[in-house]
């Protein structure tokens, strides 16, 4: 019974209230912060649990009044409303009971690279960057370009962006994979549709404490920054290339004005990549059911097609097709795709958890 599953959460919440109101905890800032965070995480399910248990009590009370000559009709109406509310609350609680992705509240790095299709792929990277920027603005996130390499006719060969905001990872993690674009290039005189592809890698931003890097494992090179077409954009050796020797991961950053800033940004990206590598290894060891969840983030997985002549956008993971490509790209309306992905993910997770 669902009610019995809620009891431990209610007890723990009361226990946390007592602990946080004790005088001992005031002298231990670290413990107080940890307990406050746990309390905040429990609050949504506790509030919903109390509403659900109150609804169950009200149902029983109204059932007892059905034969009452004065209150019977009123109880019947009230019971109908409560019986409709009960399954809705149960579904909301089941979703709240699902295991949380520990990265969901983090900021997220988006690493976008042009793949097959040459210049057309680079141009689409540029278009997608603009669309993501509008999406970030819509949700109140901040977007920073960490590093970039421009395409020869515009757009980007590759770009790394950091999207900052509570829950940024929980939504944009579904963008990881291969994105295919079909459209007529401006240089195409015959009106033929060309197909190109780009890849998006998603990585949560991590703290220094979570990823420790031995300085002896790093090879740091400095060089002159190069601009569009390879020309030097300044006269100082401000560009930084960091190689993580054990894994072979290489990060180059030249977008900042100082060597220090570029090295700092490159280290953030390196830590995110190492964390992503560790997470991928951890997930690979888990059950096939766990791995089947939507959005593995594997950049080799073809997740979406953008067909401009048909104004169509299709997400292949959930067989979703919308004929609103222009609006989604122009206004950054990616929630029209992300929301169904989240719903699908939750449905799969509920099945796996037998909730």
UniProtKB/Swiss-Prot annotation:
* GO MF term set: translation release factor activity, codon specific
Q: Which InterPro entries match?
A: PCRF, Pep_chain_release_fac_I, Pep_chain_release_fac_I_sf, Prokaryotic/Mito_RF, RF-1
Q: Which domain of life is it from?
A: Bacteria
Asked if the record carries the keyword Metal-binding, the reply is: no
Where along the chain is composition biased (Basic and acidic residues)? 280-291
Positions carrying N5-methylglutamine: 231
> Residue ranges of region Disordered?
280-303
Q: Could you list this entry's UniProt keywords, alphabetically sorted.
A: Cytoplasm, Methylation, Protein biosynthesis
Its localization reads: Cytoplasm
* Family statement drawn from the similarity comment of this UniProt entry: Belongs to the prokaryotic/mitochondrial release factor family.
- PANTHER family noted in UniProt: LD18447P
Stated role: Peptide chain release factor 1 directs the termination of translation in response to the peptide chain termination codons UAG and UAA.
Q: What is this protein called?
A: Peptide chain release factor 1
């Amino acid at each position: 019974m669902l009610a019995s599953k809620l009891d431990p959460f209610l007890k723990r919440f009361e226990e946390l209230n007592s602990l946080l109101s004790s005088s001992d905890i005031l002298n231990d800032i670290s413990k107080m912060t940890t307990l406050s965070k746990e309390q905040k995480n429990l609050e949504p399910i506790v509030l919903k649990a109390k509403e659900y248990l109150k609804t169950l009590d009200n149902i029983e009370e109204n059932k007892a009044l059905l034969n009452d000559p004065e209150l019977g009709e009123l109880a019947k109406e009230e019971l109908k409303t409560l019986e409709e509310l009960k399954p809705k609350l149960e579904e909301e609680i089941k979703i709240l009971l699902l295991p949380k992705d520990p990265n969901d509240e983090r900021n997220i790095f988006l690493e976008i690279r042009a793949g097959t299709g040459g210049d057309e792929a680079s141009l689409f990277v540029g278009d997608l960057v603009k669309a993501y920027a509008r999406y970030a603005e819509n949700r109140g996130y901040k977007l920073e370009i960490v590093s970039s390499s421009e395409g020869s006719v515009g757009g980007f060969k590759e770009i790394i962006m950091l999207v900052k905001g509570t829950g940024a990872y929980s939504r944009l993690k579904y963008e990881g994979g291969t994105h295919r674009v079909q459209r007529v290039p401006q240089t195409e005189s015959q009106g033929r549709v060309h197909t190109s592809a780009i890849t998006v890698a998603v990585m949560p931003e991590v703290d220094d404490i979570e990823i420790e890097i031995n300085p002896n494992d790093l090879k740091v090179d400095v060089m002159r920054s190069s601009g569009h077409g390879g020309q030097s954009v300044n006269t100082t050796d401000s560009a930084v290339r960091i190689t993580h020797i054990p894994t072979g991961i290489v990060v180059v950053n030249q977008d900042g004005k100082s060597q220090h800033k570029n090295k700092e940004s490159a280290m953030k990206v390196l830590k995110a990549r190492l964390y992503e590598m560790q997470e991928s290894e951890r997930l690979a060891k888990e059950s096939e059911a766990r791995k089947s969840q939507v959005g593995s983030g594997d950049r080799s997985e073809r997740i979406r097609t953008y067909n401009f002549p048909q104004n169509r956008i299709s997400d292949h993971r959930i067989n979703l097709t919308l004929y609103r490509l222009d609006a989604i790209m122009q206004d950054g309306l990616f929630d029209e795709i992300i929301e169904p992905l989240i719903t699908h993910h939750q449905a799969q997770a509920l099945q796996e958890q037998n909730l």
